[in-house]
């Protein structure tokens, strides 16, 4: 077991009950362009056209052969583009339950471990489940024909308010194990299943599949942490990773021939009336998913974690491709007179500047207030408290802000994704957002080497 000591479990109110309920009937689903780093779509459908679940909607121009498929059957309601015609979303109006679908090849469970790699890749590409895989470094969809040094399956989640993966995997353990057998065909290295200490996920007889326990505060459950300790990456060493619900979907596809776009998500946060786990579908409309479940007031709905999720609004108001959590916070519009000098028992701080810091068992109703604007980046040790990886966070963050890609690469930025720096943003006394500057530097490194 690997136990980390640095990090932070955010003491936020509104954690969900760990029991799955059926969610509302979803009438609209969407694929979001922002979920896929560096993707340039070549559209294969038009507005008004009817599609089946699993039918290709567009192909990536940069990596031909990578298709993005419909998560439900219905009619293409809108294809939304932003500035410079960047794809925002492809919205589908679900019809007849949304389950009219294309059929794919399926196999007996005993044959999965013997399938040729090319056959596995071909079916994943055709079904669209290839896009569930992401590379590290750069967090992009893998190129067809490439081979990773290892594959990581993230079967734990330490993000604030997250669902317990063990509850979800227990319902579909056979499909999960089948998915692991299929994933093992894509690499000559290990398939690392990373789970929380004490979790019972069964065991694969295949020696290629290894189970790794992690314990400690967030980010113990992030794939970046797992990769850092087990298979550190570089420009010459690439690994892939995938979420546990996508591993279940792959197992279902190869054993039944049907594309499984079901998704269990946690609807949680201080502004949710009854935080709960809901069974819904991939790309579900957030407005429909949260209808009648939020407290009164001006709320900010986030697809993903409060630390690293996406504010949903307009054409992007749909469940993110890689999210299994919808968080809701109150918009912080109120101004506080002399708030910096008040004892503040209802405010949390990682430093000893508020009374709330000393209330160890208290849960806080966080809002979107940042309690200040941008200022100088002051190195007072906050970043080191929440960064368990073997890097120098203050120096790295400084170089990211300066856009110094050479120094940032030497300090380990290739191991990171936006979510890995979310805690650094949260505890930053200068109120900087480190995720976008990390992405800018990673893009520069990828282009220039």
UniProtKB/Swiss-Prot annotation:
Superkingdom of origin: Bacteria
Top EC group: translocase
GO biological process: sodium ion transport
Reactions it catalyzes: a ubiquinone + n Na(+)(in) + NADH + H(+) = a ubiquinol + n Na(+)(out) + NAD(+)
GO molecular function, one term: oxidoreductase activity, acting on NAD(P)H, quinone or similar compound as acceptor
EC number(s) recorded for this UniProt protein: 7.2.1.1
Keywords: Ion transport, NAD, Sodium, Sodium transport, Translocase, Transport, Ubiquinone
Known partners and oligomeric status: Composed of six subunits; NqrA, NqrB, NqrC, NqrD, NqrE and NqrF.
HAMAP family: NqrA (MF_00425)
Entry's family note: Belongs to the NqrA family.
Biological function: NQR complex catalyzes the reduction of ubiquinone-1 to ubiquinol by two successive reactions, coupled with the transport of Na(+) ions from the cytoplasm to the periplasm. NqrA to NqrE are probably involved in the second step, the conversion of ubisemiquinone to ubiquinol.
Protein name, entry field: Na(+)-translocating NADH-quinone reductase subunit A
């Amino acid at each position: 077991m690997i136990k980390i000591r640095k990090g932070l479990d955010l003491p936020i109110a509104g954690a969900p009950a760990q029991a799955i309920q059926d969610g509302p009937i979803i009438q609209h689903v969407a694929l979001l362009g922002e979920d896929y780093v560096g993707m340039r779509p070549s559209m294969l459908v038009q507005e008004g056209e009817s599609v089946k679940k699993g039918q290709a909607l567009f192909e990536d121009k940069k990596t031909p052969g990578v298709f993005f498929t419909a998560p439900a059957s219905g009619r293409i309601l809108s294809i939304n583009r932003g500035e410079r015609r960047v794809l925002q979303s492809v919205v589908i109006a679900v019809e007849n339950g949304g389950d009219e679908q294309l059929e794919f090849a399926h196999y007996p469970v005993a044959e999965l471990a013997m399938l040729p790699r090319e056959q596995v890749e071909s079916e994943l590409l055709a079904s669209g489940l290839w896009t569930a895989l992401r590379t590290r470094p750069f967090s992009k969809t893998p190129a067809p024909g490439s081979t990773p040094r290892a594959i990581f399956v993230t079967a734990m989640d330490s993000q604030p308010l997250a669902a317990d993966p063990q509850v979800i995997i227990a319902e579909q353990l056979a499909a999960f194990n089948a998915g692991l057998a299929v994933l093992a065909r894509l690499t000559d290295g290990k398939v690392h299943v990373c789970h929380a200490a004490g979790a019972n996920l069964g065991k694969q007889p295949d020696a290629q599949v290894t189970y790794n326990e992690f314990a400690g505060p967030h980010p113990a459950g992030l794939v970046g942490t797992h990769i850092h300790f087990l298979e550190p990456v570089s420009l010459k060493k690439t690994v892939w990773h995938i979420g546990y619900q996508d591993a279940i979907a792959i197992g279902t596809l190869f054993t039944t021939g049907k594309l499984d776009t079901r998704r269990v998500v946690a609807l949680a946060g201080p502004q949710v009336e009854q935080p709960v786990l809901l069974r819904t579908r991939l790309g579900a409309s957030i407005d429909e998913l949260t209808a009648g479940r939020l407290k009164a007031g001006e709320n900010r709905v986030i697809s993903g974690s409060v630390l690293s999720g996406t504010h949903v609004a307009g054409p992007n108001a749909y469940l993110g491709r890689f999210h299994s959590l919808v968080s809701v916070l109150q918009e912080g519009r109120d101004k506080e007179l002399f708030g910096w000098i008040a004892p503040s028992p209802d405010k949390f701080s990682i430093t000893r500047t508020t009374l709330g810091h000393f209330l160890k068992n208290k849960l806080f109703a966080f809002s979107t207030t940042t309690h200040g604007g941008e200022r100088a980046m002051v190195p007072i040790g906050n970043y080191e408290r929440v960064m368990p990886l073997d890097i120098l966070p203050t120096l790295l963050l400084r170089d990211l802000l300066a856009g110094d890609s050479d120094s940032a690469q030497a300090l380990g930025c290739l191991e990171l994704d936006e979510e890995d720096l979310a805690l650094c943003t949260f505890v930053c006394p200068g109120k900087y957002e480190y995720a976008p500057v990390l992405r800018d530097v990673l893009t520069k490194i990828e282009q220039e080497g």
